[in-house]
A protein has these predicted regions:
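Boundary/linker segments of alpha-helical solenoid repeat arrays
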Residues: 505-518, 547-561
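Hydrophobic/aromatic-rich core segments of domains that either
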Residues: 145, 149, 153-158, 164-174, ...
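TPR/TPR-like (Sel1-like) alpha-helical repeat modules
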Residues: 501-502, 533-553
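Secondary-structure boundary elements
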Residues: 67, 71-207, 211, 265, ...
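Bacterial signal peptide processing site
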Residues: 25-28
Length: 584
């Protein structure tokens, strides 16, 4: 069906860069490692346990079970706002207590899901999906999904699936800016892919051809909470014919023989996101921050429309400036037809999460599980004859695995979240922001922005170093603008974004990663001025250089505005970036 996902250190070239030591905020739990006191007589024995027969246990009544589950959820929700305790360990213990005595058969994959997953996952991963023991990774999955559900339901609002998915996509593009591959790394530690939760915290993602698709993964995760299946669309450009002499010249066995003429399949090209709604696959390109416009530039194009009408993708080209790269012809000529990569996050595949999801209701309602074979069938049904291989996307499972076993991968992840350490006030404000408490978040941002001699959160006798405070000031300014933008307070958002541009030199002129926030501020100012009808200023901000693929989307927006008034005067030049940060 498909190649098995390789979770070894060689996956996708990252293993070459990853290696040695360091601490770890992510707990390195193994299946079967849970806090002491978790097991009680009657529980199903964990894998490898010497106990072969469960002992009877008095069943908990529904009131006691409800209290246990509520306590577990409360511990997880408090963890981010009150860091430093053992909330996840205690929550995991309570999950084991809540499900003790559950029949082992309830933890098993059904036959269709197993048939889909078995060729793609190592046996140890299949075993982990079916374990009866709840682990710290499960508690993390619950935390992630509660965050995603809160955002998706708040932003998506009411309406049909497409309307809600469009709102979520637009929110992501405004709130999560793009940065170039490698820009969040350091000489000591490379940039590594980030899970959606971490992307939300830092407000930065990387999208590039092929490997980097962090904003796309976030779109998948949020749409999952809307009940909308989203996958990455792939296609191929044909095969490569190896020259007769090439292999022999490199000293390879068999060089010059007929095998040297064998055609080698090219790797699939990862294109954009397809969201399934109303029996159609709608196209959203997180790389450029735009849905593909439908016929005559209206609505969102479906895959069927893009395959039928060459003008739809031709409209995405910017001749002489920025080619789009994918055309109707390249899609129709794909030897592998149209493939789909599905989210491989382990939690969404595990029957444990299906059990837990059934017990979540009301304010705790969260989507934790999606049957992988049913999702595969959904894509196959919608794509029809054009459907190629529908399989798991390897990156999500790889990231989750490395975060729990590879110390250097963890350090690479944490270096992008330094200012979100529990010792600084930014993390609490940002969590409130993402949970929709915009008033509370704004109050928190204001309380430490531009503060002097601010003490550490966890040690009032020590003050925050100036370099850290400068970074907190920048992030607070950016997030104040984004919070006001979410409140539709465009005047306040404009003021904060303009102030941010006054503070930040061009990225690259000094080592601070937060200087890249200039690019997001410029794009958002373009959106604000477009909404106000100030098209000349909107065009000016859309035209500002941005080294990511978002620049292509910004130029498309600018082009559409120019076409509305082709004889209008050129925009006035914008103020230059400061050479050095002015005093804050």
């Amino acid at each position: 069906l498909s190649r098995r996902i390789d979770l070894g250190t060689g996956l996708v070239c990252l293993g070459v860069a990853l290696g040695l030591a360091a601490g770890c905020d992510y707990s390195r739990d193994r299946v079967g490692d849970v806090p002491s006191g978790t097991y009680r007589p009657g529980m199903v024995a964990p894998p490898g346990s010497s106990r072969t027969q469960a002992q009877p246990v008095a069943a908990r009544d529904s009131t006691e079970k409800a209290a246990i589950l509520a306590s577990s959820i409360e511990l997880i929700q408090r963890a981010a706002l009150q860091p430093g305790g053992d909330n996840f360990g205690l929550a995991t213990q309570k999950l084991n207590q809540f499900f003790e005595g559950t029949p082992q058969a309830d933890y098993q994959l059904d036959s269709a899901a197993r048939a889909f997953l078995q060729p793609q996952l190592p046996p140890v991963k299949l075993s982990e999906l079916e374990t009866t023991v709840w682990s710290l990774r499960d508690a993390r999955h619950l935390e992630d999904c509660m965050m995603y559900y809160g955002i998706a339901s708040r932003v998506g609002g009411t309406g049909d699936d497409l309307v809600r998915a469009r709102r979520v996509f637009d929110w992501i593009v405004r709130q999560i800016q793009l940065v170039p591959p490698g820009s969040l790394g350091s000489p000591q530690l490379p940039q590594v892919p980030a899970r959606p939760y971490d992307v939300l915290l830092r407000g930065m993602a990387t999208e590039s051809e092929g490997f980097w698709a962090e904003r796309s993964w976030l779109f998948m995760a949020l749409c999952r909470q809307l009940g909308v299946d989203v996958g990455l669309v792939t296609y191929s450009r044909g095969n490569v014919v190896e020259p007769l002499v090439g292999r022999a010249g490199r000293g390879e066995r068999g060089g010059g023989g007929l095998s040297a003429m064998a055609k080698q399949p090219k790797p699939d090209i990862v294109w954009l996101c397809a969201a399934l709604a109303g029996g159609q696959a709608y196209l959203f390109d997180a790389r450029i921050g735009l849905p593909i416009p439908g016929p005559d530039g209206q609505g969102v194009a479906t895959l069927n429309q893009a395959l039928a009408d060459p003008a739809i993708l031709e409209r995405m080209n910017l001749p002489g400036q920025s080619p789009y790269g994918t055309s109707r012809a390249s899609l129709l000529a794909s030897p592998s037809r149209i493939g789909i990569l599905m989210d491989s996050s382990q939690g969404f595949l595990s029957p444990r999460m299906k059990l837990l999801q059934r017990d979540l209701a009301g304010k705790n309602r969260t989507i934790l599980y999606r049957d992988p074979s049913q999702q595969r069938d959904h894509f196959a049904r919608v794509l029809g004859d054009r459907c190629g291989e529908v399989k798991l996307w390897s990156i999500p499972l790889y990231v989750e695995t490395e975060l729990f076993r590879n110390a250097q991968f963890v350090q690479s992840s944490l270096q992008t979240l330094r200012l979100f350490s529990p010792e600084f006030p930014l993390i609490v404000a940002r969590i409130k922001h993402l949970r929709g408490d915009l008033s509370g978040a704004i109050q928190e941002y204001v309380s430490f922005r531009l503060a002097e001699n601010l003490p550490l959160v966890n040690d009032k006798k020590k003050t925050i170093p100036k370099e850290i405070q400068d970074g907190l000031d920048i992030y607070a300014t950016n997030y104040l603008a984004l919070a006001q933008l979410e409140r539709n307070s465009h005047v306040q958002a404009e003021s904060m974004f303009l102030r941010l541009l006054e503070l930040l030199p061009q990225p690259g002129s000094n080592p601070h990663r937060y200087n890249m926030l200039r690019w997001g501020a410029q794009a958002n100012l373009g959106r604000i001025y477009e909404a106000k009808g100030d098209m000349r200023r909107a065009i000016a901000y859309y035209g500002q250089l941005d080294p990511t693929m978002q620049y292509h989307g910004n130029l498309l927006r600018a082009r559409d505005l120019v076409w509305q008034e082709p004889m209008a005067a050129a925009p006035d030049p914008l103020p230059p970036a400061p050479k050095v940060p002015p005093g804050r």
